[in-house]
């Protein structure tokens, strides 16, 4: 009775003329404050009016449409299981539900009252400290019941470890918003990455006209933007999504004169945000922590000499001074460089032909390459000095803690396969950046998981390219409040670790996971369906060490994107849950051999809530598809 009165009070003014059309239906639904997909409302409205051959509905039709869109049988079943009168949940009944089903073992009574006050829309019911079915729907559909743990939505990890102890959200070719040959360079690439919590940006610097450096994909037809404009964007957005340090990874192709200009822009625009000297002792034996570097911007570039030598020059005018960096270039025909893909391949090049060889060809003779660096720019490099990777043995013997390596995707994959223990040992000491192979002209991405498995901190992806790799990236870095830094597991931080992702042995910490896939709600209509009648299925995927990789697929529900019901349970045993991600992918079965992507959600396995949860869905481009969701029950131990 109270629900009916509440409902009529909200909508009855809309029916003063007896009947309403589709637009008025949408406006009334908005007054009820429950999100809806317009395509589904259109579909239900059309089914209603088609019966009568008219284009308006009465108040009872509207009630039926509202219930079809908002009231869910699966919610009603749970509600009735705990409500003695099947009309309202008393605070004690809600407390019992929270304890038994949602595992709120502490403070359940307080939480129950908070839920009632926050979600109960009917005044009389709320005053009695009860929850109506309308309130229960609103609670179960809310952020408080999403599958991502509430505790992990803010920074909860220890942020006082050295920088090398964290996975760091990193982008590759940040300035591009499409492909790498003729696409535009765009400041929006930097804005978008920073707003997503990215903490390492790549800036490709080249000589520009009027002594003004430009940013673009060298030797290609991509458009150019000024370095100055990029730094202004960094200054504005660096800490919009996270307080923790931003690293500017310079891919520097500039003359020393324009390198001087780069240094001036960094100093003048970023001001106090730019880190220009070490924190604490000048002699650096350990990298500082993200906490110590809050609101700081670091420059990653080649550097002349040591930090100590830089500080001795402090205060001296180094304008016009240059230094020289020498490094051995040991190349073989499968060697990758961080050089950009030219528009036209050089004739006679054997690089591309040899990428598929099963065994590496003999190494060629080492050449010594010398590069000139403006001292003004060199001195801005403090904790992120770019150092060419020679070998794990060389790094262990000679590399300083603030020297970082960039390793190409193909070489890194070989290390993962043949020298995983050494790779883990290396990344426990030094920040290591992985970048995509040069042949990815379309800005495609590799699977980042295999490099996270060995502790690589900066696994750089093309943020502009949608697909599973970026979904894994976005899902992983949801953790720790989305701040862009995630503390690596202890076995990837410990310098004496013998962890190997291919044979986890004593590092196994098995977790048994059970997920009951109950239903879907207002799934996005298929792009290939004109009738709004998708045939949805859900694929559950585990990403982690090779032993943990798994895929399970639900049955197909025919012709129902509005409210498909599965009630299927999937079980997994995960050996290294600390590295695992779980991905829910919803597809429309087009044929026996083809499916159309409808939406997905990825999150760290250890960020799963327990109990009844909604799984929000995201589009290919990473946009939220609200109110599209899955409804699941999660249990693990």
From Swiss-Prot:
CC annotations in GO: nucleolus; nucleoplasm; nucleus; perinuclear region of cytoplasm; pronucleus; sperm head
Primary location recorded for the protein, binned into one broad class: nucleus
Needed cofactors: Ca(2+)
PI-PLC Y-box domain mapped to chain residues: 377-493
EF-hand domain: residues covered: 36-72
UniProt subunit comment: Interacts via its C2 domain with PtdIns(3)P and, to a lesser extent, PtdIns(5)P in vitro.
Segments of skewed composition (Basic and acidic residues): 310-322
All copies of domain C2, residue ranges: 493-619
Molecular-function GO terms, alphabetical: phosphatidylinositol-3-phosphate binding; phosphatidylinositol-4,5-bisphosphate binding; phosphatidylinositol-4,5-bisphosphate phospholipase C activity; phosphatidylinositol-5-phosphate binding
Reaction it catalyzes: a 1,2-diacyl-sn-glycero-3-phospho-(1D-myo-inositol-4,5-bisphosphate) + H2O = 1D-myo-inositol 1,4,5-trisphosphate + a 1,2-diacyl-sn-glycerol + H(+)
Organism: Gallus gallus (Chicken)
Protein name from the UniProt record: 1-phosphatidylinositol 4,5-bisphosphate phosphodiesterase zeta-1
Function summary: The production of the second messenger molecules diacylglycerol (DAG) and inositol 1,4,5-trisphosphate (IP3) is mediated by activated phosphatidylinositol-specific phospholipase C enzymes. In vitro, hydrolyzes PtdIns(4,5)P2 in a Ca(2+)-dependent manner. Triggers intracellular Ca(2+) oscillations in oocytes solely during M phase and is involved in inducing oocyte activation and initiating embryonic development up to the blastocyst stage.
Protein's UniProt keywords contain Lipid metabolism: yes
Domain PI-PLC X-box: 157-302
EC number: 3.1.4.11
Tissue: Expressed specifically in testis.
UniProt-annotated location(s): Nucleus; Cytoplasm, Perinuclear region
Compositional bias of kind Acidic residues: 324-338
């Amino acid at each position: 009775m109270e629900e009916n009165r509440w409902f009529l009070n909200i909508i009855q003014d809309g029916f003063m003329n007896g009947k309403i059309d589709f637009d008025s239906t949408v406006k009334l639904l908005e007054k009820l404050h429950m999100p809806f997909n317009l395509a589904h409302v259109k579909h239900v409205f059309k089914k209603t009016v088609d019966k009568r051959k008219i284009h308006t509905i009465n108040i009872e039709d509207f009630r039926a449409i509202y219930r079809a869109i908002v009231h869910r049988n699966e919610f009603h079943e749970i509600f009735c299981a705990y409500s003695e009168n099947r009309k309202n949940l008393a605070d004690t009944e809600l407390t019992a539900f929270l304890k038994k089903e949602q595992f709120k073992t502490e403070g359940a009574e307080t939480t129950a009252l908070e839920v009632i006050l926050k979600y109960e829309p009917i005044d009389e019911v709320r005053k009695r400290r009860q929850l109506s079915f309308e309130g229960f729907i609103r609670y179960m559909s809310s952020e408080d019941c999403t599958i991502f743990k509430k505790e992990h939505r803010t920074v909860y990890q220890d942020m006082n470890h050295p920088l090398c102890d964290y996975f760091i959200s990193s982008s590759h070719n940040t300035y591009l918003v499409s492909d790498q040959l003729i696409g535009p360079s765009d400041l929006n690439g930097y804005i978008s990455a920073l707003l997503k919590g990215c903490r390492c940006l790549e800036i490709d610097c080249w000589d520009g006209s009027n002594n003004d450096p430009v940013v673009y994909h060298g030797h290609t037809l991509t458009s150019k933007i000024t370095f100055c404009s990029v730094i202004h964007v960094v200054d504005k957005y660096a800490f919009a999504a996270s307080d923790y340090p931003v690293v500017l990874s310079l891919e520097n192709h500039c003359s020393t004169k324009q390198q001087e200009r780069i240094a001036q822009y960094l100093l003048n625009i970023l001001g106090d945000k730019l880190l220009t000297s070490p924190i604490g002792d000048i002699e650096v034996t350990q990298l500082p922590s993200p906490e110590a570097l809050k609101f700081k911007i670091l420059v990653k570039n080649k550097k002349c000499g040591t930090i100590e030598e830089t500080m001795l020059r402090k205060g001296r005018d180094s304008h016009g001074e240059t230094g020289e960096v020498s490094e051995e270039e040991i190349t073989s025909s499968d060697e990758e460089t961080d050089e950009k893909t030219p528009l036209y391949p050089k004739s006679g090049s054997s690089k591309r032909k040899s990428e598929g060889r099963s065994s590496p060809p003999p190494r060629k003779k080492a050449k010594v390459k010398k590069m000139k660096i403006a001292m003004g720019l060199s001195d801005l490099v403090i904790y992120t000095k770019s150092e060419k990777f020679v070998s794990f043995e060389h790094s262990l013997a000679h590399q300083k803690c603030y020297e970082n390596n960039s390793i190409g995707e193909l070489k890194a994959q070989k290390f993962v396969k043949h020298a995983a223990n050494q790779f883990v040992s290396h990344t426990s000491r030094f920040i290591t950046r992985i970048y995509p192979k040069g042949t990815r002209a379309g800005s495609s991405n590799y699977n980042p998981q295999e490099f996270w498995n060995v502790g690589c901190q900066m696994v750089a992806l093309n943020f502009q390219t949608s697909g599973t790799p970026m979904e894994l990236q976005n899902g992983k870095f949801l953790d720790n409040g989305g701040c862009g830094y995630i503390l690596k597991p202890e076995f990837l931080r410990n310098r004496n670790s013998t962890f190997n992702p291919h044979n986890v042995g004593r590092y196994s910490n098995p977790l048994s996971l059970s997920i009951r896939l109950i239903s879907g709600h207002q799934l996005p209509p298929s792009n290939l369906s004109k009738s709004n009648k998708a045939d949805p299925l859900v694929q559950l995927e585990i990403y982690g060490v090779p032993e943990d990789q798994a895929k399970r697929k639900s049955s197909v529900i025919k012709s129902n994107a509005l409210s498909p019901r599965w009630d299927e349970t999937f079980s997994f045993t995960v050996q290294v849950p600390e590295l695992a991600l779980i991905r829910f992918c919803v597809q429309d079965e087009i044929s026996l051999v083809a499916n159309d992507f409808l939406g997905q959600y990825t999150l760290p396995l250890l960020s799963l809530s327990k109990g009844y949860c909604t799984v929000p869905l995201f589009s290919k481009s990473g946009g939220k598809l609200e109110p599209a969701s899955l409804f699941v029950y999660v249990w693990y131990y």
